[in-house]
Amino acid sequence: MNVCKLKEIVPLFPRSSFTDGVVSTGKSFRSWDTCMDNKACKIIAIVGIVLACILVIWLIGGLLTCFRQGVTGIGQFICWCCRCSNDRNGNNTMPVNEGFSRVNMGVAPPSTVIYQPIQQPESAYYRNDAKNDTFYDEVKTPSNEVYELEEDFDLEKQKEKTRKKQQKERNKEGRSPSRVAPLVYEEENFEGSSPQPQYDARNSFIQNAANTGSNNAHVASQSPIFDISDYGENYYYDNNNINNNLQGNSYNTPSSNHRSPYPTENYQSYQGYKPNQSDRYY
């Protein structure tokens, strides 16, 4: 008997339907038309196309992220699932106070800087006292009129007003009754003495001090008349016994009736100038 004929009649490995389906499906991949005719080949083709599209989109996004963020962008784009999980865990956790941890670690925390926006100065309301120089005056006046000041605050203007006020106060003090020039009483004319013209008090004092060598000689000069603006307010003046003070020996003898050219307290007497001593006594 021929062996080939036996194989055809009794096959060694009988084929099943599953095996025939796999073989036919593999043969259908040879062309698009035959693949679309086979059901299994069509499903496999559609799934493969979808996966290929997802892979292409993933790679294109990673390339664009690399151009924008550098090489690390590729890893972040490929591991998007890991990144999403990390972000989700980060949102669930409590925020960490880095400044507190730095203090515990022994590192000084940075100084806190608070930035505030620059605002324009607001206009203020001042009372109108009907004066030209009322830019920053905040005083009560009889007028009840209130007007809005449109100008902004100016430090130079405030300084100028302060100087003007100080100047006005000094002028008022200069014209006060306490600083008015004193009245000078007419001195009595004694026998043998003639009135002498008035002269400067300072020059008279220097001249009398220079003539200390001739103490026995009479000083033929009138007692000086001092100006209160030069010696202050508290000066002592007495018109009694003026003739005794005109003598030369009055410089060596203390006299309680001598007019003091310097300010004194409680109107104490002036002892005069002593040629033997270099200090003055009040």
Swiss-Prot record:
Coiled coil: none annotated. Its main location: membrane. Glycans are attached at residues 91, 132, 276. It is a single-pass membrane protein. The modification Phosphothreonine is found at residue 141. The chain crosses the membrane at residues 43-63. Signal peptide: none annotated. Residues 253-282 have a biased composition (Polar residues). Residues 153-183, 246-282 are annotated as: Disordered. GO terms for cellular component: cellular bud neck; fungal-type vacuole membrane; plasma membrane. Present with 996 molecules/cell in log phase SD medium. Not known. Seems to be able to provoque the non-Mendelian trait [PIN(+)] which is required for the de novo appearance of the [PSI(+)] prion. This is [PSI+] induction protein 2. The lineage of its organism: Eukaryota, Fungi, Dikarya, Ascomycota, Saccharomycotina.
